[in-house]
Amino acid sequence: MGSEMCIRDRTKALLKVHTSNYRIVGFTETVTIDELIPIAQEHDIPIIEDLGSGVLIDLSKYGLTYEPTVQDSIRKGADVVCFSGDKLLGGPQAGIIIGKKKYIDQMKKNQLTRALRIDKFTAAALELVLQEYLSEEKAIQNLPVLRMITESKADVEKRARSLKRILQNAHLAATIGMEPCESQIGGGSLPLERIPSMAVTIKPENISVPKLEEEMRHLSMPIIPRTANDTIYLDVRTIESCYFKKIAEMLGELL
């Protein structure tokens, strides 16, 4: 009833926006899309849902917190759904709007459409990424962000041992180790989600950690580590195995 009291003659739509990069915790409450749909239908106004980061795969089956998928929103009755082309979707930076044809057609006629539309290169890149989603297995395998967040801790640990061995064999002026850590997803939809992971640690002998971190960030292929307890942490979940030897070579220039 509280939501309906806000509807006036000039109300043209109901908009539900994902909190995206933050969460309000404690004694709080938020209206759901299921509650808004009948209100919108009763007053004959469209409902728009901004999902933040576009999620096309139910990530809860991989042990992550459930996030509403684009398909869920459409299935429940949202008239227009908008979301990002990058972030969890894994494509180029873009805004995507889907929904009922009559509303999409109105947007196409708006004068701002020409100014805000993406270029052909972005459209081509986005098309290739979306084609991966024709097979969930293929998307998980080929899109880096999905592959990283769904990789098992055992597999991450196995790769961490490999990176540790490569760095040790590079004879760096540092102590190389391994420690459990947590990967934080963020990405516009999962700001509080943390995944158990494994980090390779570097304790330099002849250079301070802040100085080493700075020089790592200025390499030709920047390495962005996490620092704590006078130690460099490389979260292996976020590193492709094909870069392990390159990382060892570049660190060899600094240590």
Regions found by a protein language model. Name each.
Residues 14, 95, 198-200, 234:
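Well-ordered beta-strand positions enriched in small/hydrophobic/aromatic, beta-favoring residues
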